[in-house]
């Protein structure tokens, strides 16, 4: 391997690595060992590239994985300690592979407790975030025994890293400029008291490393809660349904709303308004054959359109799907025949009504929920008064009727004036 990394330690196992380092500092960086604790320097020099390239990938990996192969170190002292000797950590990275490995380095967490002062640990992460391609290729190269364990960790880290930059809040929460104190605390607690002890004795073997790797790679996953909120595109199941549930059937019914108003179906509209606000799809309330209800209910559905309700992520939810009265009529007929659809039936209905299969599926889900509520007796029979809760709900039709009502008022006023 390159001479400067290996020459300083001729004897087989003279001293523990940290003492050996202070005794024989590396020729090209004549500074004492404590230097590894200096923040900027330690951070700016990736331990991975230094170790991996100077010691040569073969020997370093062999040593870290095997933990004991005495001869495998190519002349430097055998055994596990040699891979982590501080001279290899401090020396400037060799020009050829330094950059490539460096981008991968921050994600290479197992060594964080070893190399960096706790306070600075999180700081390297932002530096490594943008260039992901090298990291991916790096992950490809980790197939040897050395990183068998890490290999599985890396892809998830890649995923995390890709997601991290687009957060709205976290960068500050995670590593803000005043990160040092908080980060020191969190990292210390995260990687348990051990790493402090482990840092004092430079000798680690792979068995020790693996727990560290698990420890240090586990903490990052807290972000995922944000993902489904920040990126609604991610399929967080509950969310998809809820938003679709709220978004099902409405404004298309609005025109129907006006005619329903003229029909003056007071009890009906009140009931189905309550239902739809309770989250049901509010198609027909009682026995289906009474088809008059389906245009009406479209409208009543239109009334509780989600007005600026915000999801946890802070985005206002998308508008509810507008079903036309014809679509509602067909869906009701289908539901009357069959409460549960097969996949083929669902795709046929969706195709016939020019809806997506998801819309049909969710309409049926909501309709079944309402049907079960009715069966359970929550809803009074269609003819009876709404016994459930005598709360008076006046559905305000959203769209045309505003103008109609206004003109009626004007006419009444004009009629009242003379």
Swiss-Prot record:
Disordered: region residues: 1-90, 214-320
GO molecular function, one term: DNA-binding transcription factor activity, RNA polymerase II-specific
Domain of life: Eukaryota
Keyword Nucleus attributed: yes
Main localization (coarse): nucleus
InterPro entries membership: GBX-1/2, HD, HD_metazoa, Homeobox_CS, Homeodomain-like_sf
Low complexity compositional bias, start-end: 274-294, 302-314
Keyword DNA-binding: yes
GO terms of biological process kind: adult walking behavior; neuron fate commitment; proprioception; sensory neuron axon guidance; spinal cord motor neuron differentiation
Biased composition (Pro residues): 8-17
Pfam families, per database record: Homeodomain (PF00046)
Gene Ontology, cellular component aspect: nucleus
Name of the protein: Homeobox protein GBX-1
The organism of origin for this protein: Mus musculus (Mouse)
Gene name for this UniProt entry: Gbx1
């Amino acid at each position: 391997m390159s001479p400067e990394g290996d020459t300083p330690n001729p004897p087989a196992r003279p001293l523990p690595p940290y003492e050996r380092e202070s005794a024989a500092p590396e020729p090209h960086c004549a500074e004492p060992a404590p230097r590894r604790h200096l923040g900027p320097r330690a951070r700016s020099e990736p331990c991975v590239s230094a170790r991996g390239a100077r010691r040569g990938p073969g020997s370093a990996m062999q040593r870290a994985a095997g933990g004991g192969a005495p001869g495998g170190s190519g002349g430097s002292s055998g055994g596990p300690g040699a891979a982590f000797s501080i001279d290899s950590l401090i020396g400037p990275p060799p020009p050829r592979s330094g950059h490539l490995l460096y981008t991968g380095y921050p994600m290479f967490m197992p060594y964080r407790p070893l190399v960096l002062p706790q306070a600075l640990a999180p700081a390297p992460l932002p530096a490594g975030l943008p260039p992901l391609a090298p990291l991916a290729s790096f992950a490809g190269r980790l197939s040897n025994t050395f990183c068998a364990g890490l290999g599985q960790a890396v892809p998830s880290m890649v995923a995390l890293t890709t997601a991290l930059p687009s957060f709205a809040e976290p960068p500050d929460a995670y590593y803000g400029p005043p990160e040092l104190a908080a980060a020191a605390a969190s990292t210390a607690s995260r990687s348990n008291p051990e790493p402090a002890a482990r840092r004092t004795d430079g000798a680690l073997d792979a068995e020790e490393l693996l727990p560290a790797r698990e420890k240090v790679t586990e903490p990052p996953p807290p972000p995922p809660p944000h993902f489904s909120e920040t990126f609604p595109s991610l399929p967080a199941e509950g969310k998809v349904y809820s938003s679709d549930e709220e978004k099902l059937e409405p404004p298309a019914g609005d025109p129907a709303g006006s005619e329903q108003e003229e029909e003056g179906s007071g009890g009906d509209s009140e009931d189905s308004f309550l239902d739809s606000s309770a989250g049901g799809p509010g198609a027909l309330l009682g026995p289906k054959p009474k088809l008059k209800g389906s245009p009406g209910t479209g409208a009543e559905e239109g009334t509780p359109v989600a007005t600026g309700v915000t999801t946890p992520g802070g985005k206002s939810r998308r508008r509810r799907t507008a079903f036309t009265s014809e679509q509602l009529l067909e869906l009701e007929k289908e539901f009357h025949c069959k409460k549960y659809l097969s996949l083929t039936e669902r795709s046929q209905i969706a195709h016939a009504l020019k809806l997506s299969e998801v819309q049909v599926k969710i309409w049926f889900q909501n309709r079944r929920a309402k049907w079960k509520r009715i069966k359970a007796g929550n809803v009074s029979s269609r003819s009876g008064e709404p016994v459930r809760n005598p709360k008076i709900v006046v559905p305000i039709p959203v769209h045309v009727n505003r103008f109609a009502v206004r003109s009626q008022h004007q006419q009444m006023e004009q009629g009242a004036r003379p």
